[in-house]
UniProtKB/Swiss-Prot annotation:
Gene Ontology terms for molecular function: ATP binding; DNA-binding transcription factor binding; magnesium ion binding; MAP kinase activity; protein serine kinase activity; protein serine/threonine kinase activity; ubiquitin protein ligase binding
The protein's assembly and partners: Interacts with sox11, hmgxb4/hmg2l1, rnf138/narf, stat3.1 and mef2a.
Organism expressing this protein natively: Xenopus laevis (African clawed frog)
GO cellular component: cytoplasm; nucleus
Similarity field: Belongs to the protein kinase superfamily. CMGC Ser/Thr protein kinase family. MAP kinase subfamily.
Protein name: Serine/threonine-protein kinase NLK2
Superkingdom of origin organism: Eukaryota
Length: 447
């Protein structure tokens, strides 16, 4: 079952980079030409209409910038090899220090590792220049029309069918990531891309990393946008597991039901207070990994009983099955929180699974006698993502050489490589849009 849209594109929030210079393509190679550059259109809530099967939908609008973020701009561009429109993401200034080098290399390898319909992956990487001039990376991904944040804040009605099929796809993609040993660590509506047929893909792996199995190894707490941050991170836990992503999905589930952020606080402490207002004062066993200050903050306050019944007031779509699944996701104790695999087996998502695999997915297909379904509706990764190479990375130049070789190797035996074409008529518009945004980002970061 597809969810058709108007066929027009909606700007989506994607992470990319601010262009700091031009890359001259090597002689004899094809140009990758951003062509377009019109103003970004306003969000079109009609992109989600009443659920029905209608095939693939219309093509996007002409090429243009489709998203701005703290790291720059993403453009819709045309691949000259086949005429298809795709998204072009830039990772700028990636070799400034060893930490950023490792992060970008990890994200790049992940984008090339992913093979799942609900996880954004790299379709191609633009050919890099000679290593001495190599400072930025351009990644081509599938073009998506909007993100879940824009869907939620739009006036477009969201039916129970929409909510179920969105949640099903989020958990389907998350099950795949977790099976590969990957924690996303920034699941939020803006990082869930949606096309005009309501197909959803998890994106933005800048904070993603392999799950650390050794509990003695500390992990950063500077992860996850605050509204979607799990209580164990808010309470200073130095080690966490995939349950942090499930908490984020629970917050998004509630947001889909109520069309507003579930825990919207001004500070991490207030965020924790809002969580305990809903879930009640947690037992000591649920705070086993909390820092002393956070534990003391909870214990010196008045005892709070749970008030989970208010979840039924989110909307008319908050049925008993919906609230039951939501409560399994929003458990204070991460060890008791439901997994993506078990959540997918919940009765609430049965209809979402059926609708998705009826005519939205690529793993099932129709024949004259009916629908042929895949043997595995929610596949896992064939192997864990290997990050063991990171231990041997000791210098910026070493990483730069490895990244350059990695990108070059991606093109071996494949289609002709592409490069940025600075002579394109639209390139000046591209540069102006990124230069303007660069100044805005700089001012924002100073505040």
């Amino acid at each position: 079952m597809a969810f058709p849209g108007s066929g027009r594109s909606i700007p989506g929030q994607l992470c990319a980079g601010v262009f700091s210079g031009l890359i001259q393509p090597p002689l004899g190679q094809k140009f990758y030409c951003p062509n377009g550059g019109g103003a970004v259109p306003s969000p079109l809530p009609q992109a989600l209409s009443a659920p029905q099967c209608n095939g693939e939908g219309r093509d996007p609008e002409p090429d243009r910038p489709i998203g701005y973020g703290a790291f720059g701009v993403v453009w819709s561009v045309t691949d000259p090899r086949d005429g298809k429109r795709v998204a072009l993401k830039k990772m700028p200034n990636v070799f400034q220090n060893l930490v950023s080098c490792k992060r970008v290399f990890r994200e790049l390898k992940m984008l090339c590792f992913f093979k799942h319909d609900n996880v954004l992956s790299a379709l191609d990487i633009l050919q890099p220049p000679q290593i001495d001039c190599f400072e930025e990376i351009y990644v081509i991904t599938e073009l998506m029309q909007t993100d879940l944040h824009k869907v939620i804040v739009s006036p477009q009605p969201l039916s129970s069918d929409h909510i179920k099929v969105f949640l099903y796809q989020i958990l389907r993609g998350l099950k795949y990531l977790h099976s590969a040993g990957i924690l996303h660590r920034d699941i939020k509506p803006g990082n869930l891309l949606v096309n005009s047929n309501c197909v959803l893909k998890i994106c933005d792996f800048g904070l993603a990393r392999v799950e650390e199995l050794d509990e003695s190894q500390h992990m950063t707490q500077e992860v996850v946008t605050q509204y979607y941050r799990a209580p164990e991170i808010l309470m200073g836990s130095r080690h966490y597991r995939s349950a942090i992503d499930i908490w984020s999905v629970g917050c998004i589930f509630a947001e889909l039901l109520g069309r507003r952020i579930l825990f919207q606080a001004q500070s991490p402490i207030q965020q924790l207070d809002l969580i305990t207002d809903l879930l009640g004062t947690p037992p000591l066993t649920a705070m086993r990994s909390a820092c002393e200050g956070a534990r003391a903050h909870i214990l010196r306050g008045p005892h709070k009983p749970p008030s989970l019944s208010v979840l039924y007031m989110l909307s008319g779509e908050a049925t008993h099955e919906a609230v039951h699944l939501l409560c399994r996701m929003l458990l204070f104790d991460p060890l008791k929180r439901i997994s993506a695999k078990d959540a997918l087996a919940h009765p609430y998502l049965e209809e979402g699974r059926l609708r998705y695999h009826t005519c939205m997915c690529h793993c099932c297909y129709s024949v004259s006698s009916g629908r042929v379904y895949t043997a595995d509706f929610e596949p896992t990764a064939t192997n864990r993502f290997d990050d063991s190479y990171e231990k041997s990375l000791t210098s910026v130049w070493q990483v730069k050489e490895l990244v350059h070789r990695f990108i070059t190797d991606q093109h071996q035996g494949k289609r002709p490589p592409l490069c940025i074409n600075p002579h394109s008529a639209a390139f000046k518009t591209f540069i102006r849009s990124t230069a303007w945004h660069s100044s805005k980002v700089s001012k924002k970061e100073e505040r």
